[in-house]
Amino acid sequence: MRTFLLAVFTLLNVVAIQAQSLNLETDNGVKYNDPQVPASIGIVLYSNDVETVFNALRFANYSQEWDNQVQIFLLGKGVELEGLVKTNEDIKKQVDTFVGQGGVIMGCQTCFQSRKKDGSQICKVACIQDLYDLVKKNQIVLTF
């Protein structure tokens, strides 16, 4: 009986801890998971697949509509975005909307160099430190 009560007590403590973790608050009392509070979102885009790129940009634009700050870092094949913009009108519209709303797009300098390119018209050439900063400073980081 004593073991059973100890197990129940332990389980109740675990449930209480998990319930508290769902309502974590910052120092100023704002809940982390509060959908009414804007977040900072970093997106690492490392694909040149049209559907994946389109959905990443669509998500970025949707997030901006909810007053979230969004940054995109192009990595690997992601730096080929400019070519997709030239050949796909839907992606061009998404990029234009994102940049027009103040969104920031950065592209990996090394990835451009490996493709014998100096950079892109649609993004700032960036380095590994910029990618590190994006991951470190944003509350949410997604990869596509």
Task: For every predicted segment, state its role.
Residues M1-E25:
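Bacterial Sec-dependent N-terminal signal peptides
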Residues W66-I91:
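Mature extracytoplasmic domains of secretory-pathway proteins
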